[in-house]
Amino acid sequence: MGNTTSEIQTQNVEAQPLISTEEQLSVDNPSIQSDQSVDTVENTVNDTVNDTVENTVNDTVQSIINKKYVHPVIDLINSNQSENEIIEVLKSFVGTNVVGTNENGQTIYDCVDQVELFGPAMQVFCHCACYGKKDVTDWILKNYVPLQVSYGDNFTFFETQKYKHFDISDMLVKHESFVPSYEVMQNLLSRSKYDLLEHCLNNPNLEKSHIDHYNLFIQYLSNKQYSNINELLVSLKKDSNTPIVSGNESETQPLQVTEIVNVNDNVTLDEISYSEIVTDTLPQNVESGIQLESTTEVKPESTTEVKPESTSEVQPESTTEFQPESTTVVEPESTTKVEPESTTEFQPESTTEVEPESTTEPQVESTTEFQPESSTEPQVESTVEVQAESMNESSYFQYNKPTYDI
């Protein structure tokens, strides 16, 4: 019996595997387990780094947004630093620092571009002058070259007067960039600053267009007629509401366009149209009238003759000649007859232009018009014969009336 039980247990043990499938895989392929662990570590590290960087960036951006940049020179206005500390900061930005000496023993300075810091320097200057920081104001007046003490119509001068910093306002008057005005000179006159008033009159920035006024100022100052100076300043202030500007500064006015001229580059020339040929007619006392055509010419080969018994002729005036147009020649019509009852004689006008008084206008398409291209020559059917006699190429024409029996 004992042997049977042991045999059954041996068979069960042999039927079961010695290790599990997962353990067998890890034993057979040890790289699988190592790769999984590496991936886990990498993911953990990446997440940690990303979170750290993101938090750091967000904190930095938020700090930049919350804190606005202020220039160190402008920051001097809000600080409680002493005047010496302010001067040291100004020296580091706009001052001239001594670097050393060269081979010849000359001093070498480190100069900066002061124009780049014009805005901050002007703000610090106005602040220190108005709040009575005389040492800083004096340092800026002597060391900052682009300084303009009269900006804003001498704003700093009148602010120092407002806060009763008269010594600083007197320092401004002596600066080379100061532009004196009538109000400034009145202020100096009221405070008995005659030397500064004379300095303003000799200031090159003072407008000296009215030389008579300048001479009067000098005369009143030399004679100590200060009341006259005040009256002159008041009268000049009434005449001119604008402050006196420097002679170097030009008063520029905006350009005003008064007229706008449109110019077209595409020039189109109109076609030259010659005047149409106009046919003028003489006063018509006959049936169809005598027509003047521009293209007709007098035929010199006409065989018609004037009978000697003709006693009535149309004689042009002694001083007036009938001048037809340059291309117009009179062509007598073959079918026209002279009415004996007509007592009207044709008198050419002195203006050499024939203006027909008849209400009948010449018809271009009339059958009585002579066609130069026609081969038919005019036939004289009546007893009246008209001769167009040419004295020369530019002579006048005579029209002879024939005699008739009553």
UniProtKB/Swiss-Prot annotation:
Compositional bias annotation for Basic and acidic residues: 296-310
Keywords of this entry: Lipoprotein, Myristate
Region annotation Disordered: where it falls in the sequence: 291-406
Domain of life (superkingdom): Viruses
Keyword Lipoprotein among record annotations: yes
Transmembrane portions of the chain: none
Bias (Low complexity): 324-333, 341-351, 359-369
Composition bias type Polar residues, residue spans: 311-323, 370-406
Covalently attached lipid (N-myristoyl glycine), positions: G2
Protein name stated in the entry: Uncharacterized protein R554
Source organism per UniProt: Acanthamoeba polyphaga mimivirus
